[in-house]
From Swiss-Prot:
Single GO term (MF): metal ion binding
Organism (species): Beamys hindei
GO biological process, one term: mitochondrial electron transport, ubiquinol to cytochrome c
Transmembrane region(s): 33-53, 77-98, 113-133, 178-198, 226-246, 288-308, 320-340, 347-367
Name this polypeptide is given: Cytochrome b
Top-level taxon: Eukaryota
Keyword presence, Chloroplast: no
Protein function: Component of the ubiquinol-cytochrome c reductase complex (complex III or cytochrome b-c1 complex) that is part of the mitochondrial respiratory chain. The b-c1 complex mediates electron transfer from ubiquinol to cytochrome c. Contributes to the generation of a proton gradient across the mitochondrial membrane that is then used for ATP synthesis.
Quaternary state and interactors: The cytochrome bc1 complex contains 11 subunits: 3 respiratory subunits (MT-CYB, CYC1 and UQCRFS1), 2 core proteins (UQCRC1 and UQCRC2) and 6 low-molecular weight proteins (UQCRH/QCR6, UQCRB/QCR7, UQCRQ/QCR8, UQCR10/QCR9, UQCR11/QCR10 and a cleavage product of UQCRFS1). This cytochrome bc1 complex then forms a dimer.
Binding site for heme b b562: H83, H182
PROSITE patterns named in the record: CYTB_CTER, CYTB_NTER
Family that this chain belongs to: Belongs to the cytochrome b family.
């Protein structure tokens, strides 16, 4: 009898995606992060569902409903902190996943890469709206500051902001719609992930050498299922360690104060994973310019396939480009640090230099280094 996984219409899809999928034999642990992101997404949807059962999206009761979850609901504190820190783990995996794509030239799979960028925007939007829900000081003021950026759009800006707010300030209507969007977006993300995988399986996975690997493919199961399970164990270990020993390490103490429209916190800042983009936003003195720089800081990823000048795909054999890549990583870490600092000297100057450097590395240095390498190899 033919194996059911090869004949059943549903099992056939699963089989071609996760069992008999031909995979390059040499992909390293940097390729684990795709499956880890899937685990993070499932974890976030599950914990989020249980939180939504007890949360109320009303300005008068939102903060106390989160307190109620932590104090009165069975293991509510665990679910809440798994969800909050799960978001941090999600973004750590996301940044490494994107970084791996840049390093090994995975952006040459244009469709997969572009869907990935859309996914990144969707996850960032979801995380931002989720941060508003506990209705603490940083939730309220973060929502006010970030949504207010849309007022920089000429002519329609002010109307657009009031339309998003559902009034003349961030209030009950804003919180309710943010909760609705925060609930629905993860399911849209799941659909986008399926499209992402569909495009990936059209071309097959890239590998560290960046070379054609059709001659040396192995089945996904059992080799990479075992490898992914190891990665999953490590991820869950770090997440549980964070939740049980330092649940508030990555949060903001201001969010333990209920939202007060009459009292502005001294330093309004988003969650740590947005700090690099926030630093770029703050580095531009002009409001509209800042908003454009903020959007471009992520959208610039879409330019990478067009800026790829090298005859080689991966950075594995390109030492000058490797230096540029690690310069970019260091620059993003500096921007993350600056985003959490007050707006004063010397942080303003450091932020502006780091922001300019961010765009220079991607647009000028990386393509230039590839051309130099091709010249050295006499490939021009």
């Amino acid at each position: 009898m033919t194996n059911i996984r090869k004949t059943h219409p549903l099992m056939k899809i699963i089989n071609h995606s996760f069992i008999d999928l031909p995979t390059p034999s040499n992909i390293s642990s940097w390729w684990n992060f795709g499956s880890l992101l899937g685990i993070c997404l499932i974890l976030q949807i599950m914990t989020g569902l249980f939180l939504a059962m007890h949360y109320t999206s009303d300005t008068t009761t939102a903060f106390s409903s989160v307190t109620h979850i932590c104090r009165d609901v069975n293991y509510g504190w665990l679910i809440r902190y798994l969800h909050a820190n799960g978001a941090s783990m999600f973004f750590i995996c996301l940044f490494i996943h994107v970084g791996r794509g840049i390093y090994y030239g995975s952006y040459t799979y244009m469709e997969t890469w572009n869907i990935g960028i859309i996914l990144l925007f969707a996850v960032m939007a979801t995380a931002f709206m989720g941060y508003v829900l506990p209705w603490g000081q940083m939730s309220f003021w973060g929502a006010t500051v970030i949504t207010n950026l849309l007022s920089a759009i000429p002519y329609i800006g002010t109307s657009l902001v009031e339309w998003i707010w559902g009034g003349f300030s961030v209030d009950k209507a804003t919180l309710t719609r943010f909760f609705a969007f925060h609930f629905i977006l993860p399911f849209i993300i799941v659909a986008l992930v399926m499209v992402h995988l569909l495009f990936l399986h059209e071309t097959g996975s890239n590998n560290p050498t960046g070379l054609e690997s059709n001659a040396d493919k192995i089945p996904f199961h059992p080799y990479y299922t075992i490898k992914d399970i190891l990665g999953a164990f490590l991820l869950v270990f770090f997440l549980i360690f964070l939740v049980l020993f330092a649940p508030d390490l990555l949060g903001d103490p201001d969010n333990y104060t209920p939202a007060n429209p009459l009292n502005t916190p001294p330093h309004i800042k988003p969650e740590w994973y947005f700090l690099f983009a926030y630093a770029i936003l703050r580095s531009v003195p002009n409001k509209l310019g800042g908003v454009l720089a903020l959007i471009l800081s992520i959208l610039i990823l879409a330019l990478l396939p067009h800026l790829h000048m090298s005859k080689l795909r991966s950075l594995m054999f390109r030492p000058i480009s490797q230096i540029c890549f690690w310069l970019l990583v260091s620059d993003i870490l500096i921007l993350t640090w600056i985003g959490g600092q007050p707006v004063e000297y010397p942080f303003i100057t450091i932020g502006q230099v780091a922001s300019i450097l961010y765009f220079i590395i991607i647009i000028i240095l990386m393509p230039a280094s590839t051309m130099i390498e091709d010249k050295i190899l006499k490939w021009d």
